[in-house]
Amino acid sequence: MLGSILAACGASGGAAGRATIDTWDWWVSQSPWVEHEIKRFEQAHGGIHVKRTVNATSSYDKLFTLAERSNSAPDVFMISTTTVPLNEQVAKGWLLPLDRWANSSWRKRFPAYSFVEGINMFGGKVYSAPLTKPAPWLQLYINNKVFKDAGLTNADGSVKVPRTWDDVTLAAEVITKKGNGNTYGLGFGNGSFPILPWWVEVFVRAAGSPGGSTGPDLRTGKFTFGSDRNYMDFAELLMSWNRKGYFFPSSISISDEIARAYFERGKFGMTIGGVWNQAEWTQHGFTDYSLTTLVGPAEKRAGYFYSSPGGTLMAVSAQTRHADEAWAWFDWFYGVDAGKSWVQEYNEDLSVHPQNNDPRKIHFRPFAEYVAMESLSIPGPGASIRNPAQAFVVVNPVQPDLGTILTGIYTGQIKGVQAAFMDLDTRLQGALEQGVKQAQQQGHKVSLDDYVFPGWDITKPYRWSIPEYP
């Protein structure tokens, strides 16, 4: 198919097959897959060379924005919206609309609800696409050797994977006591950025708090850190674990990268992280671990991770001089075959193409465990799904944010936990209201009511009232 597209481009006078395509991303652990696909693409499209630049995550947005403003943007790039929201990038003419290639038949290669106005489509035109299927983005990782050394095993010799808050507490207690100052039950790395909100995602969502660490509870449209008891209960649990010495002592100061290394060396038995950890650990020869997610007060989960339709990752620059060749690389990147190697060979994440996500076809057990968790991410409502004009609502971040507050709770600098959570709710709600007000003043028809879904059952998949294929 790609070959015929390029042949047609060449027949119409295009320069297909005689170009260097500049592409930017910030992926490091996923680099082996990207380089593999570039090699395959270049072999299949002789003469097109993909020149890849990997930028640091911390500087990518600034570099990308400068490149756009100086008319030196790469042909294909990973989308960054830290400074300029995607809808504004489209309005500024930074992104190339892809409709001359991404027609109805191309879009139907993807599952229903992959393309959504206000997310990856604007004015009915396609600008990006999802690469992955939504999945539980954070997991509780268990070092099997640490658990076995502590006697935390089942009758068959497998490790006792914690299912509840009490299970985690018991395991942390046993590991710490038997570790004699060499091994601890729990650990994390908070030195580079506040990472404790990740713990809220895993432990509080399962308790029935759909806002997790970031959003309002969309049943009411309100932020509920101070009014939802689950957040206070988890804060007390966190303080209890710390007070009893279950955490690796330097967790608050070491980086997440160092924490991952310490986990694989058995300095602590449990940590929170994402599937991106697995590739790094495999490179280091560490594969003896298990994982779970959504660990709540009870074994029966009262909430889930919630997904939205659509998705973005890569886009093509409106400045490109090689639109056909840039599209060819974009198309390859999002293809079923590339998705198959993404899942089954390189074990990176779920593919947007469901036929690639069969745990039985994955040989690496920890990644197969992750793929098998996909049912724990279910469709949820969203303001921008209900009203695409919500894309024009810009909500400014607040400080101190949840990560800063949790760090203060952990270190003991914050004594009034309930008051800190309630103050956070007030500031977050104010920022949301201000964002909506500013969008209204700009002429956009948005409302705080867009954030309220009173009939939402958080234990069941939400049915979106949007076209499956626009």
PLM segments and residue spans:
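Glycine-centered hinge/linker elements that transmit conformational signals in sensory
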Residues: 167-173, 215-252
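Short helix-initiation/N-cap motifs at beta->coil->alpha
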Residues: 54-63, 83, 162-167, 250-264
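Conserved N-terminal structural module of periplasmic/extracytoplasmic solute-binding proteins
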Residues: 1-92, 154, 161, 337, ...
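Extracytoplasmic/periplasmic solute-binding protein
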Residues: 122-134, 138, 148, 166-223, ...
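Hinge/lid segment of periplasmic solute-binding proteins
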Residues: 82-139, 290-293, 466-470
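Long, aromatic- and glycine/proline-rich binding clefts that accommodate carbohydrate-like moieties
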Residues: 292-294, 344-411, 445-470
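Short, solvent-exposed loop/beta-turn-alpha elements that line the ligand-binding surface or hinge
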Residues: 99-112, 156-161, 207-233, 283-284, ...
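Extracytoplasmic/periplasmic substrate-recognition and gating elements
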Residues: 43, 70, 244, 283-355, ...
